[in-house]
Amino acid sequence: MILVITNKEDSHPTPVIQLLTTRGISVFRLNTEALLTDYEFCWQNDAHHCDFTLANIQNGLSVRGTEVTAVWDRRPEPPTELPLQSTEVVDKHNREEALGFLRFLRYYLKDIPSIGSIVYDRVAASKMLQTTIAQQVGLSVPDTCFSNRKADILRFAMQYKEIVLKPIENSNIWNEDNEEEYALYTQKTSSASFHDVPEEAFTQTVSYVQNYVPKAYELRITMVGRRAFACKIDSQCLDEDKGKTDWRQGYDYGLKHEIYNLPQDIADKCIRFLQLMHLNF
């Protein structure tokens, strides 16, 4: 039995679940925002063993913890739905208790083979750790600087003709006034342009900059265990603000993708990278 821990809005698990089902593989989907409304659950132990049950009261499917042989932990959301509304304080407490249970249940499953990990995914998101491990396995990485001081960023930038600025954590900004979302893409700029930026622009936040590396094309490599699936992205035929600098901007401008035969030495380094990050995906 594969336990898929996700959310209602994520459509990507659906075709995967359908394919697994046609192959006779049992799957249980847990949409975490509806933990308290769409599911009944119980975890308990006695002197002999520990186990839990999950039952979807909407479709009648159920699973026991001892039946779970693999976990796909994909973008779970905090529990938000409640069977009944109470006061704001009580509702907040009930949601937090459900979130605590959900987190602890996912920790409890940490030793089961998984795609996605509550233990290591967050750690592996660290740009500093990614850079360090990538260098350790022999991958080339751009020179990088994080700082809240203009002097540090300027000193770093002056070593190069051009640098790129990247978001650290949040690549989107939601404007509540006009209810519009803005995407923060990687931006290329001349190093000299930093001279005119006021000091307070740096002290207000953390700047994440790297030297700009010209490229012939880009690769997006998906690792599943020891298997590498490489996609060549032909971003350099696009304009600067339409995918050349950040390929994600190219979706609406004819961005081309094609299968790429990844050299084995690069695949081996990617495998080692995942191993050191304690990830399977």
Please annotate each region the language model reported:
Residues 143, 207-208, 281:
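A short linear hydrophobic-aromatic micro-motif
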Residues 7-22, 30-143:
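Conserved N-proximal alpha/beta basic substrate-recognition cap immediately N-terminal to
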Residues 1-3:
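Extreme N-terminal starter segment of soluble prokaryotic enzymes
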Residues 123, 129-183:
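Loop-centered beta-sheet repeat module
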Residues 12-14, 150-154, 216-218:
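Short, well-ordered alpha-helical microsegments
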Residues 274-281:
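Conserved metal-phosphate-binding beta-hairpin within the catalytic cores
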Residues 265-274:
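A short, acidic, amphipathic alpha-helical segment used as a generic capping/interface helix at domain edges
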Residues 20, 158-262:
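Phosphate-binding site of ATP-dependent enzymes
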